[in-house]
Structure formats: C-alpha cells, structure tokens
C-alpha cells in the first residue's frame, strides 16, 4: 500500500505481552466463567446464526452491512443473557471487600445490573456511560480512584478512549464481536496505578444450554454454532496465555 511504500515495512512492534513483561502494564489474573444461555436465548442465537450463515457463508470474506448488523444482534444475545445476573447474585456475597471494580454490562440488562449491585448488594457505585459528559466522567473517575465509589457499572465507555487505571477487578458481562475492541478494553484496565500490583479479569462467557453439551458434536445445533463457539474459545485462550494463572 502507499503507506507501506512511504514508511517502509514495520520493523518493530510492541504488543500487550511485551508491555506487561516490561512493566508498562499491570500483570493480571484471568478467570473465565461459563454461564448457560436460556432455551429462549439459545433459540434466538440459532436463528440469527442461520441468517448470518446465509448472508456471510465464508468468514474470510468482507462482511456486508446487513450481515454485520445480524452479527452484532447475535452478540447482544450473549451479552445480555439473564444467567449473568444470576451468576452475579450468587457469587457477589460480601460487598465489603469490593473496591476499584468495574462491571462492564450489556445494554439490555444494564439497569438490572445497576439495581442488583446497588440496591440488593449495597455497593456504592455509579453508572459510567455515554450519558455522562466529560466533566461528570472526570469527577466519577476521581471518586473511583479515591475509593469513594466501590464500583463503576460501564457500557461502551471503554471503547471510547477512556482509561481507568485504578481498576483492580473487572467483570466482563459483555464481550465484543470485534476482537480489537475487546483487547482494548483489557488494556484500558491494565494501566499502571500506585499500589496496584496486579488486576483480576472475570470474563462471563455465554455458552449454549447444558443439554447442548450432551448432544455431542454430531448434532445439527452443534454444526450451526460451531464457529461462534470457537471464536469464544479463541478469545479465552488468548486472554489466558498472557495471564499470571495461564492454563
């Protein structure tokens, strides 16, 4: 391309692994947590996958605008699974030990996540979304850094160039259909901060209902969603490879 012709070949890259090893980013523990889609959610997921396959049969080819909208809609099914609320309710028992924590939520369950964490779990928190202007965001980040806020419940903001270096724990209820965006989200919470030795990433991964596992690889449903499941697996693998607790 003209850019490569002008600047020449890339002779040096500085990736996430190097940034962590050289101390520019904080090391992290990675905890993938599978949660099962409901039957209704899975039916919608299957339907969208069928439509996407017809519109975009070859993954290595450019995706059309219509197919992209369907892919995003399918990702939203995973991001907004009701099972993620159940998981939070079950696993966040004591609120006293929670601090400098971000919950990255899907849009449809966002208000329910706020209610669960703020009302039922009694966390001192605030939403952190596109609705907050830059001045408000700045005040919230300052309160978060001081510890006045235990948590921020975020939606999309980590895709908009917002770094949150005081973050020590991040719950990813929502992933992204774009790999680059998800890598950026991880990088934004790994920024160094005084006293921050490591970070924890808890990744809630939506998978097909439990009965799907018992159907085996020969089932029609497995064939339909195989590529999507593989993408989730590759994301988990990538995140795990750079984690302290690599497995």
Where are the model-predicted features located?
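Conserved nucleotide-binding/hydrolysis micro-motifs of P-loop NTPases
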Residues: 1, 18-21, 34-39, 108-109, ...
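Short, charged, surface-exposed secondary-structure boundary motifs
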Residues: 1-2, 132-140, 179-186
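Post-DEXD/H (motif II) to motif III coupling segment of the RecA-like Helicase ATP-binding lobe
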Residues: 1-30
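Conserved strand-helix element at the start of the C-terminal RecA-like helicase core
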Residues: 31-42, 46-115
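Long, largely alpha-helical accessory region at the distal end of helicase-like NTP-driven motors
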Residues: 75, 213-247
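Conserved helicase ATPase core of P-loop NTP-dependent helicases/translocases
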Residues: 100-104, 109-118, 122-159
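A short beta-strand element within the Helicase C-terminal
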Residues: 151-155, 159-176, 181-184, 198-204
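Conserved segment of the helicase C-terminal RecA-like domain
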Residues: 188-224
């Amino acid at each position: 391309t003209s850019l490569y012709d002008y600047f020449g070949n890339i002779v040096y890259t500085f990736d996430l692994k190097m940034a962590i090893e050289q101390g520019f980013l904080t090391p992290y523990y990675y905890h993938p947590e599978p949660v099962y889609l409901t039957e209704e959610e899975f039916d919608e997921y299957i339907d969208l996958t069928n439509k996407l396959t017809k519109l975009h049969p070859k993954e290595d080819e450019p995706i059309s605008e219509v197919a992209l909208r369907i892919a995003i809609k399918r990702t939203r099914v995973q991001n907004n699974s009701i099972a993620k609320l159940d998981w939070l309710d079950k696993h966040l028992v004591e609120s006293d030990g929670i601090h400098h924590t971000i919950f990255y939520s899907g849009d449809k369950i966002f208000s329910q996540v706020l209610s669960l964490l703020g009302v039922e779990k009694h966390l001192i928190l605030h939403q952190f979304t596109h609705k907050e202007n830059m001045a408000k965001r700045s005040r919230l980040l300052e309160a978060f850094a001081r510890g006045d806020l235990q948590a921020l419940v975020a939606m999309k903001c980590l895709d908009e160039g917002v770094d949150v270096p005081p973050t020590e724990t991040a719950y990813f209820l929502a992933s992204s259909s774009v790999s680059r965006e998800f890598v950026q989200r991880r990088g934004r919470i790994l920024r160094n901060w005084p006293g921050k030795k490591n970070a924890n990433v808890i990744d809630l991964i939506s998978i097909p209902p439990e009965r799907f596992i018992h159907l085996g690889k020969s089932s029609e449903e497995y064939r339909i969603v195989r590529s999507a499941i593989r993408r989730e697996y590759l994301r988990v693998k990538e995140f795990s490879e750079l984690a302290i607790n690599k497995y």
